[in-house]
Amino acid sequence: IILSNVPYSVHNDRVANLKDLNMDYPLISNEGMKGPAVKEILKNHKAQSFFIDDNPYQVESVYNDNQQTVCVHFSVCDLVKPYMPKAVGASIEPTSWEDLVSKLIGCLKDDE
C-alpha cells in the first residue's frame, strides 16, 4: 500500500505516475500526519509492516502511533539529505535503493 499526501483531486494522476515507475500498488490519499492513517490501515493486520518516507516528521508520526511498524527514513535527494533532521523512530536509514532493499529483506529474514 502506498500512503501519499497527494490531494484527492489528483489521486488518479498519482496512480498513473506510480504505475509508470513500476509501482502498481494500491494508493491511499492522505492529509496531514500519517501516523493515524497507518494505525487505521494496520488495525486488523498481523504481519510485519514497514513505513518508508523521506519526511522525518512523518516517520516520527508513524513511529509514535505504530510501535510495531519498522520505520524507515529514506531520501534519494542528495541535495536535501545533509539538511534533514534525524527521524525519531527510524530504525533503518538506508543510503541507496539497493541498501533499502537489502535492509528490508534482512528484517523479514530476522522475523522468520
Which stretches of residues belong to each language-model region?
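Donor nucleotide-activated moiety binding/catalytic core segment of transferases
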Residues: 24-25, 29-46
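Short amphipathic alpha-helix with an adjacent loop that forms part of the alpha/beta core around
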Residues: 38-44, 98-111
